[in-house]
């Protein structure tokens, strides 16, 4: 095994390391599809897709293109590569986080939310980038530094009806799908 003798550490526990999180997600997805098949509720003719690590999960669990063991090796290697693309302190902290922004709760349009995120990046000189528009005007994934995301949260305000327009995603310290990871993608 190429990882023999390697010790993995994270201040919050190894499941917060993306390589282990991705393995856990792949294992869960495969188990869920297997359970649906066993229960007779999985529609084999349905179109199935995944996003990001979910693409690998769909290939393995749904199509059988990848065996489970190969899937787990692949997503572990993928997560390890992403983990190492991000500078870290001696304690393993990266200085990056991922947040969910809900523009409608701050009474912002799609364009206003996009401009706000860009202005935080420009004003702070740090990464703050919408990396996925999950639902236009309702839910965006934003990657950034701890400092930039704190400023974004401040500018978004408290929201309405007791619902915050800003939610920090716990346990994520890799700025997935952002410009910060471009060095890891060959041209």
Region spans (language model):
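Alpha/beta catalytic cores of group-transfer enzymes, especially the acyltransferase/condensing modules
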Residues: 61-187
């Amino acid at each position: 095994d190429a990882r023999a003798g390697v010790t993995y550490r994270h201040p919050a526990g190894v499941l917060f390391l993306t390589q282990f999180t991705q393995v856990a997600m792949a294992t869960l997805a495969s188990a869920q599809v297997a359970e649906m098949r066993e229960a007779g509720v999985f529609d084999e003719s349905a179109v199935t897709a995944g996003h990001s690590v979910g693409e690998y999960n769909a290939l393995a669990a749904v199509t059988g293109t990848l065996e489970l063991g190969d899937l787990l090796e692949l997503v572990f290697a993928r997560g390890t590569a992403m983990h190492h693309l991000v500078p870290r302190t001696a304690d393993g902290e990266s200085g990056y986080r991922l947040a969910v922004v809900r523009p409608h709760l701050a009474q912002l349009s799609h364009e206003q939310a996009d401009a706000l995120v860009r202005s935080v990046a420009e004003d702070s000189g740090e990464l703050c980038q919408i990396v996925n528009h999950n639902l236009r005007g309702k839910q965006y994934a934003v990657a950034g530094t701890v400092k930039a995301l704190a400023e974004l949260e401040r500018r978004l305000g408290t929201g309405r009806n007791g619902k915050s327009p800003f939610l920090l995603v716990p346990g994520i310290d890799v700025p997935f799908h952002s410009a910060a990871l471009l060095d890891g993608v060959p041209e």
